Amino acid sequence: MARRSQGTKLHLAVLCLVVSCHAIGLSDLMERASQRSDKLHSLSTSLTKDLDSHFPPMGRVMMPRPSMCHTSSLQTPKDKEQALRVSENELISLARSLLLAWNDPLLLLSSEAPTLPHPSNGDISSKIRELQDYSKSLGDGLDILVNKMGPSSQYISSIPFKGGDLGNDKTSRLINFHFLMSCFRRDSHKIDSFLKVLRCRATKMRPETC
């Protein structure tokens, strides 16, 4: 009976959260999404620095080029100037497509982090879990956003991830782990940039000043 009561309370809490989110204005939702994307990018930058502290000397030479990131097939604005010329619907679609494309890679990184041949693998593992939490939270927030923006903003590009193995030897695992994190850091910067442009538009600020 107690378990049923707890389940009912949890259901009501989630229901109230959803209802309150839908009652919030578009500019406030944009602000919250921007804060989460900023944290996501900050965490990915911190993780990249952690990995840099114990990287094989030949790692930079052996690491794949950025063009090999699995999300490189998605055409996105190259800089802020280009992003300012893209519509709201397309920017939110690009942000959601990039975020969704990292669900499986983050699962792989999460499973590999605890045994990564790196002296800070415990901290790295903890930060990867944080990335997953923030990614999930941001994704949920963007889902609410697009429901407010209308059907034309709901398109998502499917970007498959085919790399399910980081390798067997220590060097390969470190290099491939670092490569995936560098790709995620690049994409988290794009997501953050797109959402900041959208936030400025929603608050009627001049986007070029953001």
Curated annotation (Swiss-Prot):
Keyword field: Disulfide bond, Hormone, Secreted, Signal
Q: Could you tell me which cysteines form disulfide bridges? A: C69-C183, C200-C210
**GO cellular component entries:** extracellular space
Q: Where is the signal peptide?
A: 1-23
**Superkingdom:** Eukaryota
Q: Where in the cell is it found?
A: Secreted
Is the keyword Secreted in the record? yes
UniProt GO molecular function: hormone activity; prolactin receptor binding; superoxide-generating NADPH oxidase activator activity
A single Gene Ontology biological process assigned to it is: positive regulation of receptor signaling pathway via JAK-STAT
Q: Name one Pfam family in it.
A: Hormone_1
Which Gene3D superfamilies does UniProt cross-reference here? 1.20.1250.10
* Tissue specificity field: Pituitary gland.
Q: Which family does it belong to?
A: Belongs to the somatotropin/prolactin family.
Q: Which PANTHER family match?
A: PROLACTIN, SOMATOTROPIN,PROLACTIN
Report the protein name in the record.
Prolactin
- Protein source organism: Coregonus autumnalis
Q: Which gene encodes it?
A: prl
